């Protein structure tokens, strides 16, 4: 039985892994073959195992900043632990380097030139025969881990997922992430904590925003808090960025929509009113249209597995707008964060009902001796 072991300190990636493995469980072919265990690891951040005593791969994940820091303080020598593990188990070794691809070689990252980081990565490949994989962010690292997991599983080599269509939650996370400084992890927390409609309507007091925490129970960055408070006070520039995160909108169209009115004005209007907005093009003027209007209302009122309307404190189920998007909603409420809007008891319990992420809890003994 193949399974992936994640170190319990990988707080930023584990939520995405749970979601990705949950998706795999819904594939009838893969239903009983994807397993995730969260434990304390002393070598690497992730292990791909065929059995409790058979390690196939050891993966270390580092951001550019982590990598630069390890070069300065000697933690780069942790690779010796990985090399020793390979000698004992004959496993493959992988380094995930997380961050924007191909920065300027002279760019300083944690006071270390990017060129020096590239040199260290090259040494890992040439000298130590480690695979180096570059990823964009935590969500991308999770996707690569799942791909590796199934590549090692003999039944799952070269299997293409049954559906590549993003879920509503993923689209809502992308919407929040359109704001500078909001990562995938913070975007996921916001998507399952409040709706954009509640934020722009001023229903989230600044003291509630100040209570938001990451999965590791750390406060949100001050920059993010200031930005959320600014949106609640009607910052037009930030409203345009948020609106541009709605599927099929974009920055130019968002700016045109909000040219004469604030975002809250349209959220308080019927969908038909938004659909009739005149959009100026080079040679003609067109209407925004019902599909885009429905998408705007749907995603700006989206919170967890429920649809939150501005004119009501109750959460009501919403029908999906007519778009090429998956209908399945996966809502994972981080343990360190509670919903910030008031809802009725019935609606609240319905909105927070988990879809279920399966994680093995049985003890595992990794024999590397």
UniProtKB/Swiss-Prot annotation:
It is an enzyme of class 3 (hydrolase). Residues 339-369 are annotated as: Disordered. Pfam families: ERCC4 (PF02732). Residues 354-369 have a biased composition (Polar residues). GO terms for biological process: DNA catabolic process; double-strand break repair via break-induced replication; symbiont-mediated suppression of host innate immune response; symbiont-mediated suppression of host type I interferon-mediated signaling pathway. Keywords: Host-virus interaction, Hydrolase, Inhibition of host innate immune response by virus, Inhibition of host interferon signaling pathway by virus, Interferon antiviral system evasion, Late protein, Viral immunoevasion. Gene3D superfamilies: 3.40.50.10130. One of its GO terms (molecular function) is DNA binding. It comes from the Viruses. Residues 3-101 form the ERCC4 domain. InterPro entries: ERCC4_domain, Mus81, Restrct_endonuc-II-like. One of its GO terms (cellular component) is Holliday junction resolvase complex. Its EC number is 3.1.4.-. Induction: Expressed in the late phase of the viral replicative cycle. Plays a role in the inhibition of type I interferon signaling pathway. Mechanistically, specifically interacts with 2',3'-cGAMP and cleaves it via its phosphodiesterase activity. In turn, prevents 2',3'-cGAMP interaction with host ER-resident STING1 leading to inhibition of downstream signaling pathway and type I interferon production. Belongs to the asfivirus EP364R family. PANTHER family: CLASS II CROSSOVER JUNCTION ENDONUCLEASE MUS81, CROSSOVER JUNCTION ENDONUCLEASE MUS81. This is ERCC4 domain-containing protein EP364R. It comes from African swine fever virus (isolate Tick/South Africa/Pretoriuskop Pr4/1996) (ASFV).
């Amino acid at each position: 039985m193949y399974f992936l072991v994640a170190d319990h300190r990988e707080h930023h990636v584990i939520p995405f892994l749970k979601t990705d493995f949950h998706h795999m469980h819904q594939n009838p072919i893969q239903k009983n073959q994807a397993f995730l265990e969260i434990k304390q690891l002393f070598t690497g951040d992730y292990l791909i195992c065929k059995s409790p005593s058979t390690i196939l791969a050891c993966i270390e994940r580092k951001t550019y900043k982590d990598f630069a820091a390890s070069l300065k303080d000697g933690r780069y020598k942790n690779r010796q632990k990985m090399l020793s593990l390979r000698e004992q188990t004959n496993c493959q070794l992988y380094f995930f380097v997380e961050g924007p691809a191909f920065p300027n070689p002279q760019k300083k990252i944690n006071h270390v030139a990017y060129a020096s980081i590239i040199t260290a990565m090259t040494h890992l490949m040439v000298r130590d025969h480690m695979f180096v994989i570059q990823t964009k962010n935590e969500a991308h690292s999770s996707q690569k881990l799942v791909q590796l997991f199934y590549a090692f599983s003999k039944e799952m080599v070269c299997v293409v997922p049954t559906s590549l269509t993003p879920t509503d939650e993923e689209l809502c996370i992308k919407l929040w992430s359109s704001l500078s400084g909001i990562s995938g992890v913070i975007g996921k927390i916001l998507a399952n904590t409040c709706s954009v409609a509640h934020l722009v309507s001023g229903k989230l007091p600044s003291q509630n925003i100040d209570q938001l925490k990451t999965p590791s129970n750390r406060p949100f960055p001050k920059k993010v808090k200031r930005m959320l408070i600014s949106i609640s006070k009607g910052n037009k520039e930030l409203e345009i960025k948020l609106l541009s995160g709605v599927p099929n909108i974009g920055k130019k169209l968002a700016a045109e929509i909000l040219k004469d009115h604030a975002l809250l004005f349209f959220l308080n209007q019927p969908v038909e009113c938004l659909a009739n907005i005149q959009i100026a093009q080079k040679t003609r003027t067109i209407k925004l249209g019902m599909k885009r209007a429905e998408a705007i209302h749907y995603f700006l009122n989206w919170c967890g597995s429920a649809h939150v309307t501005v004119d009501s404190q109750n959460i009501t189920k919403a029908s999906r707008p007519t778009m090429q998007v998956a209908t399945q909603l996966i809502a994972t409420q981080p343990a360190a964060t509670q919903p910030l809007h008031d809802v009725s008891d019935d609606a609240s319990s319905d909105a927070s009902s988990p879809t279920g992420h399966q994680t093995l809890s049985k003890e595992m003994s990794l024999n590397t001796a």
